Amino acid sequence: MWTLLVSLAAGALVSVGLRTTGAIHSTGAAVLPGVLVAAVAMVLLFRRVAGRIGPVIEEAQRHLQGGRRELAMASLRGGLELGRWHPLLEGSLRAQIGALLYDQQDYDGAAVELRRAAKRPWESRAFLACCYFRQRDDDGMAKAFEQAVKVGEKEDLAWTMYAWCLNAQGKKDAALQVLARGLEKNPGNQRLRGSVEALKEGKKIKVAPYGDRWARFGLDGSIATGGMKIPKAMRGFAQRPGFRQRPTKKR
């Protein structure tokens, strides 16, 4: 991560310079200015990277809205070169690339990207789990879903997807256990409760209430009405993290 290294180097140079030139006679006292310089340098570098990656994400979104999938993918891959400058950037971009490959039913390629992707938001791990589900990798699916529900424990859809896949594998009891865990984290959740009752009665898990959020994963062959797009929670870096955007001046 070049941002951290450059920032620390700048801070160290300031501290050493102040100490060796005699501007500050105490080594301990020379540390504080170096720390401040390192912090300022890191903030400025992060802002610079965020300012460069924001347009990349927005360009990818425009390509997707225009149905230009390959161009959207190229835009996101082009942003990977900035990953060395921000600790979270590469994982975020790979999550988005993986989601697009999943949409194209390239589950092998999607899994490769998603394994290197950030674990947050929970959708990143859920996409990976769905890849494993389609590849009939039961252990990989369970591991990825466990990560998904750990991150998104308050998201009833995460628990529902996990249970749906287990039930589809003929593991009804395991699916009920997952839904029960989901209810422990979300007491009184009517969607999870309804799915438990449906399974106990030998019916299908209820997924219709989730609409496009469920259809986005295409597990039951459903198609999102909004077409192909990166889930909002997975986009990231469309705006500078931690900083407000300057308002556009009206002419």
What positions do the PLM features span?
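N-terminal topogenic membrane-targeting module
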Residues: 24-31, 35-108, 112-115
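Alpha-helical linker/edge segments of TPR/alpha-solenoid repeat scaffolds
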Residues: 51, 68-70, 98-109, 135-144, ...
